[in-house]
Amino acid sequence: MRSMLQCMDCGREYPTNRVLYPCEACGGLLDVVHDLDALRSSVSRELFDARLGGLALPWRSGVWRYKELVYPDLADDEIVTRPEGNTNLYQSARLSEYAGIRTLYFKHEGENPTGSFKDRGMTGGVTQARVLGMKRVACASTGNTSASLAAYAAWSGLQGIVLFQNQQVALGKLSQAVAYGAVCIQVAADFDRNLELVRELSESLGIYVLNSVNPFRLEGQKTIMFELIQQLGWHAPDWIIVPGGNLGNSSAFGKGLK
């Protein structure tokens, strides 16, 4: 196999066909690692350019266009895709002038199927859930993650479960989760406690966790960088500014740029 799970703290390795979130040895976060040397001969800019703009699945997806760098050993018919990605770059002359820089672009991840970058990660996470034979997927969320999980669970035939707190909930996103048929459970606790409950449900009931602790989500989110650089003629920008929450995107972007 050309991919494995590796602990980011102690370096312990695991096969990708196991249901794991933290490292069994030290409790550290896991990362999906690919054998890039083995993949080098099958990956090229020309390959990704040839797939761009086509209608064939899964290459039409802005995530799975880069499949060799996301999940190389995966069979194409296992992929759960809407498709997502292929979000536009918008140049802003006025803001460029205001900021005193030559060129400024905005990458509009709101153009994804459920309206956020979470769809890039969820296609990877839900695909892995199906690979593992899981029947139910769950997350703790106050907004975008719940909408994305519910949508991709519905598209893949899995049961989606969302735990959300009793305040600071994005009702528009929650309505998407309800519309896509997810079981939505309101809990009188903050986000961290809801995430603990999701982990407990996973262990006791065999439900697959799809919060950012799931490393396969970051594999999808790193394609924002692949796509951005491809849109710029395979040139990396001088600076990249990204909002930070739990910094999952920061980690994913670092993987993509590496």
Predicted regions and their residues:
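PLP-dependent amino-acid enzyme catalytic core
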Residues: 1-258
